[in-house]
Amino acid sequence: MDLYERWKRTVEMLEREGIIRSLEVKEAFLKYPRYMFVEDRYKSYAHIDEPLPIPAGQTVSAPHMVAIMLEIAKLKEGMNVLEVGTGSGWNAALISYIVKTDVYSIERIPELVEFAKRNLERAGVKNVHVILGDGSKGFPPKAPYDVIIVTAGAPKVPEPLVEQLKPGGRLIIPVGSYHLWQELLEVVKKKSGEIKVRNHGGVAFVPLIGEYGWRE
C-alpha cells in the first residue's frame, strides 16, 4: 500500500470517529498529506495518528489534534488567519487550502522557517508567508485576524493575540504547564468586545517560547 492510500485510510478513520466533521477539513487533509511535511525517514510513519519528530527538537502534531483545532477554528474562504508556530508547515498548508487567501505563519526557530518553506514549496503552496519572529507577540502588520491558531502551549493567553483578533474573531490556543500538559482553549472576542473562553479539554504541546509565553 502506498503512502497516499495509507493516509487516505487515516482520514477516513478520523471522519468515522467524528473528528473530521467538515468537507473543508477533509479535502484539505487529502490535498496535503502529512508525509509531504516530514523528513524522508519519517514518511512511512506519517499516517499513524501520533506526533512525529521534525528538526530542532520539535514535533508535528498528530493528525487528530490538527483536525480538532481546524474544526474548532471554523475556517471559511477569505478569512485572515495567523498561525503561531509554523513547525513543518503542514498546518499552514491545510489552513491555506481552506481560506484560499494569504496565510501568515510565524516561527521563532530559523531552522524550522527554512524547513517549512522547503516543504511548502515542494507541496506547491504559494499563499503561506512564513515569518521568523516571536509568535507570542502576534504579527501586527497583518492584523486584525479572523482566526489565530497557536500550535504550542502557553502559560496564559497572550494579550497581544487577543488584541489582534477582529470583533467576532477566535483564538485557538493550548494553555497550561511547560511540561506537555495543557487545556485547549477557544477564546472568542465578541463584537461587543467581551471575551468568552471555552475549554476543549486536555492536550499536550511543546512550549510556546517568547515574551508572552515561556522564557527559554
UniProtKB/Swiss-Prot annotation:
Active-site feature positions: 61
InterPro entries registered for this protein in UniProt: PCMT, SAM-dependent_MTases_sf
GO molecular function, one term: protein-L-isoaspartate (D-aspartate) O-methyltransferase activity
Catalytic activity of the protein: [protein]-L-isoaspartate + S-adenosyl-L-methionine = [protein]-L-isoaspartate alpha-methyl ester + S-adenosyl-L-homocysteine
KW Transferase (keyword) present: yes
One Gene Ontology term, aspect cellular component: cytoplasm
Compartments where located: Cytoplasm
Keywords: Cytoplasm, Methyltransferase, S-adenosyl-L-methionine, Transferase
Taxonomic superkingdom: Archaea
Pfam family of the protein (one): PCMT
Coiled coil: none
GO biological process, one term: protein repair
Enzyme Commission (EC) number: 2.1.1.77
PANTHER family for this protein: PROTEIN-L-ISOASPARTATE O-METHYLTRANSFERASE (PTHR11579), PROTEIN-L-ISOASPARTATE(D-ASPARTATE) O-METHYLTRANSFERASE (PTHR11579:SF0)
Record family assignment: Belongs to the methyltransferase superfamily. L-isoaspartyl/D-aspartyl protein methyltransferase family.
Known role: Catalyzes the methyl esterification of L-isoaspartyl residues in peptides and proteins that result from spontaneous decomposition of normal L-aspartyl and L-asparaginyl residues. It plays a role in the repair and/or degradation of damaged proteins.
Name of the featured protein: Protein-L-isoaspartate O-methyltransferase
